[in-house]
Amino acid sequence: MALDKTKVAYQIYPKSYKDTTGNGIGDFRGIIEKIPYLAELGVDMVWLNPFYPSPQRDNGYDISDYTAVNPVFGDMADFEEMVRVAKEHKIDFMLDMVLNHCSTEHEWFQKALAGDKYYQDFFFIQDQPTDWLSKFGGSAWAPFGDTGKYYLHLFDETQADLNWRNPNVCKELFKVVNFWRDKGVKGFRFDVINLIGKDEVLVDCPENEGKPAYTDKPIVHDYLRMMNEATFGSDDSFMTVGEMSSTTIDNCVLYSVPERHELSMAFNFHHLKVDYEDGQKWTIAPFDFEELKRLYHTWGKEMSERGGWSALFWNNHDQPRALNRFVDIKNFRNEGATMLAASIHLSRGTPYIYMGEEIGMIDPDYDSMADYVDVESINAYQMLLDQGKSPEQAFKIIQAKSRDNSRTPMQWDASENAGFSTGTPWLKAGKSYKDINVENEIDGPIFKFYKELIRLRKEMPIISEGSYQPALEDSQQVYAFERHLDGQKLLVLNNFYGSEAEVEIPAEYQSGRVLLSNYDDAELAEKVSLKPYQTLAILVK
């Protein structure tokens, strides 16, 4: 698996990208219409969130048919045309594969419920539940029909965990992966894939809600190698990424080193918990810069030294917009957006851009709970009230942390609904769309900066291939790192604050050249005063 490390991925939440039918929901034809825009940006791979038939209890991550298209997005002919048109623009597609669990409406589960022993072995069905908790709250077990038994669901009770110990399950799932490969797909993102390694007998695990009993178990590596061999492993141009829940560096190295033939890279989320108070999501706290820096340095250095590979990202469909979390957007939206971009695009790993990030989209700033549709947010609001928070306090927390923040319609222009739909959008457009939209921003500093970062990664092996080394570790407001390759060195300085930062430039870099900055007048000296949210990359031959 010789991963092309010059590639950059772009994530599309299909429901919110572009609606061509007026039903308020984005569709494949909307994506086809915008492929020239993606080509202008310069991305190589588009990751699509699930578009399969689904009861939509978990935004399509509860799949009832793995080899069909939910008609709300179009049909298979539309999908095939989308893949073909994208290839003409040198863009490939990466699909979301949800193989830890399927919907209880899937025919496998329905046949199991009807008493078919063959399909009952596809799931974890026990006489007694364990003490494990679901990641969505409550027990991870639900009654299996009226049999008196229970089935395992680590997520919603309509998402039944699949038993990978059963070779028939593996055979069916590998058939699914190959079905989409045959459609021309060139990448897969495997949802919570490090949870597929359950033990033969499931027992109580009081520690940490039961997570140690099913997270990063050694057998996961065996399953991934089996899948690699049976599906995408023979194609060197394939890109695979595992979403890893509550994972460790040691495991991510194993998942991603090429010689193990598992996956190309791993997603981890530790850096997006640095604004959680006491580890709790539903809180408001300033981000912990020291912790952010420590995480980036630890993961960057370890993955570099041990040959692992990471997916790098600030935003996705489950997170509020990074600009709202890390930047003073009232005063420095452009500078903050470009600094955040440089801090990962110049680092070691494959960068992922989440739709709208390239134009500096921000959270929607909704006025009331009635604007939110995400079930997690609605439940959290009630939980916060139950904990004694006032409606105002609870709403402020939802405003800051809701997953709907990133799921609002893509902002194309200043017309009604941000140019996303002529109908009523499934989720209201953010308030900022009249100012922040593609039409306004395509010639603006953020979009241009993203294009430049993508170009540099393609042209400069030190960015795509170089090692990672922490730099200026004592700085209280600058996250800095070095990249090294074949005698070349690159120093990247990122000021994470809206105030200036004095930096002593290491001697060997003082005679280097400024490769990139998000301010025009960047000059080198022994001491440099970085402006608010400035990024400065210095190259030494």
Each predicted region: which residue ranges?
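Loop/helix patches that line or flank the sugar-binding groove of alpha-linked glycan CAZymes
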Residues: 2-5, 222-224, 231-237, 254-256, ...
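Acidic/aromatic-lined carbohydrate-recognition and catalytic surfaces
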Residues: 2-178, 182, 195-248, 257-258, ...
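Hydrophobic residues within beta-strands of alpha/beta enzymes
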Residues: 46, 188-190
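Active-site rim elements
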Residues: 160-166, 170, 213-214, 322-335, ...
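Beta-strand-rich binding/interaction modules
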Residues: 500-518
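C-terminal beta-strand-rich structural cap/linker in extracellular carbohydrate-active enzymes
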Residues: 525-541
